[in-house]
Amino acid sequence: VLAPGADRSHDGETVAGWDSRRFDPDLRRFGVPFFMAPINARLVRRSLALDGHLPCTYEEGVSVAALLKAAWIYISRGFGYFVGAPIPMQPTSGEGPPPWLQRAGSFCVRVHATTEDRTKSALVEVRGAGDPGYLATSKMLSEVGLALLLDEASPRGGVLTPATALGPVLRRRLAEAEEGRFMQFRVLD
């Protein structure tokens, strides 16, 4: 995705997924590469570029604890056989998880930002209900559509990302969806 002003050769500027297993000292978590990181990183890079926040370093991974929790959901319900809706192990294109699994899913994202000189930092947590690959994503897209239709979006034109087009408007909508039960945003530090 085009990121105006991005210098991909700059040593201090990387926007990518984790390339291996690691312990993240800032988040105090063991993690592994996340399969969506290459796509997410491009959108983050474009958002940062359009808002004039480059150069920066952005990395993304998934905690081992989150993977174990997901595995427990599968195992504890007998891979869906106990609830009458088996989980497809090799789903076809467009086939998502069964409804019970979409409802049982959730997500928790922690974002840690630090200035280059490490004098300032912030830790933010975003939690949401529903499988992030299907149920939660469809709700988020619905809120994007409603925000574009009903709320005041950015007056900027061109190819924008959700963050640059809607920013605080979208965050407010997501926090208020389902009477505040869908997504929660918290500053932890």
Regions found by a protein language model. Give the residues of each.
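C-terminal catalytic/substrate-binding lobe primarily of soluble NAD(P)-dependent oxidoreductases
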Residues: V1-D189
